[in-house]
Amino acid sequence: MNLRALYLLLALLLAGCSSAPTQQNKTEQVIVNQADDPATEARFSQNLNALLANVSQSQEIPLQSLESGFTDAKSIPSIRKLVLPPSGTFKKNWLAYRKRFIEPVRLKAGKAFWEENQAFLSQVEQESGVPAEIIVAIIGIETIYGRQTGNFRVKDVLSTLAFSYPDTPNKLAREQLFKDQLKELILLCWTEAGGKLPAKNTAQGVNSARFSACLNQNSSYAGAIGLPQFMPSSIRSFAVDGDGDGRIDLKQSPKDAIASVGNFMKIHGWQAGMPISFPVQDGGIAAAKELADGEPQLKYTVQELIDKGILTKQQGDLQSGGVEPTSKAFIVDLPYPDKYGVDQVQYFVGLNNFLTIVQYNRSYFYAQSVAEFAEALGYKNRSVVPVDNTSKSTNSKSGSEKAKPKKSSGKKKPKVN
């Protein structure tokens, strides 16, 4: 997702209630079909046609083929409202966010999804080093295993945000981001329909029905697609064919979704057998507050945080479930109002794997929710290292086997936070 996180910064994320995975392909979502006023639609069409001409020229795709896929494209007024930033009186609420995603219905669906895909999850875990609980947690938080994948046509979403983003301070930058995503969508759908890139000015071999179906598939109001909610650029860069049928289908194929999430996390630096985050010690809260700057960058060593009383010595010891004292970390601040409306903050120390989750969705709330969802499913948030690095004769497991993430036999399912 080329940093899918950045593309979804404007949206906390889609999610809703949970459902059993067996229902994921049966749930039909009504596609929103709106249109703007005539003047706005005219400007929209002019800008869209210019982009199509640009793609046609740069990729040598017949312009008529592109235009036929966008003849009914619309600017959707409600999308512009959905991406507006919250009002000035809005207060971030970690506890409310957590309650929304780490709840019994979603967890039950997660366990069912795990059971239905246990063998493949185990396979992906071995290949990528990403625990099954983490993968199940991400898909559960994103779409409840396919139940909530959005109800807008993706071409309408990306076209709307590319050419009529709301008047915000970052309007120009956001429009450029979505123009890029719209181009990525076109190229994704062209190749999915059998086309070559560059196309050499021919549509030979292209299934026009599949091209249109790809452009018209449902998405979130930010243009994210399928069970794992990948942006088009992320699909092209990180999605993989998990079920081996020769195509990538993140909406209908759980295996494609599972393998793609594992691949994304691996490429973005997931460290197998390492924890995600540590809670800040009560005596270190004041020090953590001073270091919290909202920037997801590994900047302090674990030893520095131990010296400040933010972490314990055990958290800097691999043999005790911690990490190397030279490992880098950063402070995660999760604000919430208490029952009296007074601002409070819960602090964690984010490690490398926390940062990897942030690459998936640039939100501390999201990343900590994934971690806690996974824990609720049985994930152990501690390092997994050999008990005795020097002893080989007394232990039946090899060092290479031990270096692998824990298997699902010791897990109960991904946890929701």
Residue locations for each model-derived region?
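Sec-dependent signal peptide recognition
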Residues: N2-A11
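C-terminal motif of bacterial Sec signal peptides marking the signal peptidase cleavage site
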Residues: L14-G16
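An acidic, Gly/Ser/Thr/Pro-rich helix-cap/linker signature
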Residues: A20-E116, S122-E125
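A contiguous strand-loop segment
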Residues: P38, S45-A50, N54-S75, K81, ...
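Structured segments of extracytoplasmic/periplasmic soluble domains
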Residues: L51-Q64, G69-I76, P104, Q123-P131, ...
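Acidic/His-rich structured neighborhood in mature extracellular/periplasmic domains
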Residues: W94-S260
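Flexible, glycine-rich surface segments
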Residues: F211-F330
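C-terminal soluble interaction/assembly domains
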Residues: G283-N417
